[in-house]
Amino acid sequence: ETKSYGTAGPRVQAMFVDYLKEKYPDINEFNREFGLDYWSNRVNTWEDFPDVRGTINESLAAEFAKFQRLLVTRFLTWQAAIVSGYKRPDQFITQNFDYDWTDHSIGYQPEVNQYEAARCMTVAGCDIYHPSQSLLTGEEITFCGNISRNLKKDNYLVLETQAQGNIAWLPYPGQLRLQAYSHIANGSN
């Protein structure tokens, strides 16, 4: 479940400034693009760039989140390159892409660009957690399964799913089999 986990330490901040310098060689253009002159938050030199955590500028916060997702993609690409040097031709590379979470998997994971990160994988892998018992609808399995299948335009592996005995999570008799068939019906191997 590799994602950015809110990484924002000093090294990441410095890397973000370098990323912005490359994207906006003219600091005046950067200030205009992000509305920093208007909000009296102008950055006069790159060396004076403030810590971006807690910024009131949503455009800047969104660009930093985009950069954090880029770091995840670079990290996974680096890992996949290492593994590629050691794996046999019949072996594959995967990673556990998870989804946003509110009591269960509900949609896109905001801390990783799964489509970009999956490029270095051989097979998409995911975890899909969904309600059980009378709350099981199949919506989470279908929605997250569709995302997973589209990462590589192929079938995917379910690396984790709902199979524990937590209160109200324990499936009804036969429901675990139903869930497995639902994953298969949505493109899981």
Language-model segments: what does each one mean?
Residues Q175, Q179-N189:
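Helix-enriched interaction subdomains in cytosolic or periplasmic regions
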Residues A80, Q114, G145-S148, A180:
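Short amphipathic alpha-helical segments and helix-helix/interface helices
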Residues P131-S132, G165, H183:
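Glycine-rich nucleotide phosphate-binding loop and flanking beta-alpha elements
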Residues R119-C120, L151-K152, N186-G187:
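Short, structured coil segments at secondary-structure junctions
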Residues E1-I141:
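Polysaccharide-binding and catalytic clefts of secreted carbohydrate-active enzymes
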Residues I93-Q95, A124-C126, N155-E160, N189:
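Hydrophobic faces of well-ordered beta-strands that scaffold small-molecule active sites
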Residues F49-E63, C144-L176:
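Active-site clefts of carbohydrate-active enzymes
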